[in-house]
Structures are given as C-alpha cells and as structure tokens.
C-alpha cells in the first residue's frame, strides 16, 4: 500500500469526519482518479513530437498514454477532424496515489519560484485542476534527453460534493496551497 493511501486510511478519514461530521463512512470524500493531459499543438506538423510527448508522459505516470484526437476541424489552427493533437493518462488505484505522492513531495517543490498552487482552481463540484509549465520537474525525466519543454494539465477528481471538502482533502494530502 502506498504512503498516501495509508495516510488516507489511517489519519485523513478520521480528520475529515471530525471536521465535517459525516455519519456514514461512504460520505467521506476520496480521490477518485487523476487525469494527466498534455496538449501537443506541434503534432500536426511533426508526428515525432507527439511520440516524444507520449514517451515523457509514460515515464512520468508509469502507465501507457492514449493519444487524443481533434473532435472537429478548426481552420484557424489548421486542424482537421481526427488529427492527433495530444495525449492523456487516467490514473486510478495505487498508481494514482503513487503519482500524487511524487507530484506533491518531489515535483512541485522543484518548480522555479514556487509559492504554492492556486487554492481557487476548483470547479464547483469538488475537482481540482492544476497546470504545470514544464515536464522536467519530474525526477523520471532526464534533462539532457528532453527535445522541448512541454506543459501539462493535471486534474484531481474527487468524490467530494463541495469545493471546501475537496480543498480540505487535498490539504490533508499535504498539497502546497498558496496562502
């Protein structure tokens, strides 16, 4: 069992019950999944760029990445329907907790001029979205082998009903929110 999962089972559940007064154990919010998405706009000119992005994504998450395709054509961006334009990974279970642990304790502190993540990036339904400007903050990525610095979106999907509950859950996981 991963460190964050153990922390959730032993400490966080009790703290959440104390704070919000849940009567049923199933009411306690938990991390449902983490979706990591990387939009690669240059993929329309060069397919090798997308391959490199997929390789980086797989190294970071430890799971096979799925290429995302354009849903509809956008003439201004020279994109046709069905063109590969990015990649994503959906993490659940143990891999999700392992990734969250690495992100919170290893990767985020390596961001330049890091003052904490935005505490207001919740969507109103208890999900948290986080944007990262460069993939080189992860220890799995070798700096010398990176062809181009790319950003990614990380979405924490929780079973929380409100943003306040989700914020407390992530704060219990030691998510470094900006003050």
UniProtKB/Swiss-Prot annotation:
Record-level GO BP terms: translation
InterPro entries: Ribosomal_uL5 (IPR002132), Ribosomal_uL5_bac-type (IPR020930), Ribosomal_uL5_C (IPR031309), Ribosomal_uL5_CS (IPR020929), Ribosomal_uL5_dom_sf (IPR022803), Ribosomal_uL5_N (IPR031310)
UniProt cross-references to PROSITE patterns, sorted A to Z: RIBOSOMAL_L5 (PS00358)
Keyword RNA-binding among UniProt keywords: yes
Signal peptide limits: none
Sorted UniProt keywords: Ribonucleoprotein, Ribosomal protein, RNA-binding, rRNA-binding, tRNA-binding
A GO-annotated cellular component: ribonucleoprotein complex
Molecular function per GO: rRNA binding; structural constituent of ribosome; tRNA binding
Record family assignment: Belongs to the universal ribosomal protein uL5 family.
Function: This is one of the proteins that bind and probably mediate the attachment of the 5S RNA into the large ribosomal subunit, where it forms part of the central protuberance. In the 70S ribosome it contacts protein S13 of the 30S subunit (bridge B1b), connecting the 2 subunits; this bridge is implicated in subunit movement. Contacts the P site tRNA; the 5S rRNA and some of its associated proteins might help stabilize positioning of ribosome-bound tRNAs.
Complexes and interactors: Part of the 50S ribosomal subunit; part of the 5S rRNA/L5/L18/L25 subcomplex. Contacts the 5S rRNA and the P site tRNA. Forms a bridge to the 30S subunit in the 70S ribosome.
Protein name: Large ribosomal subunit protein uL5
Gene: rplE
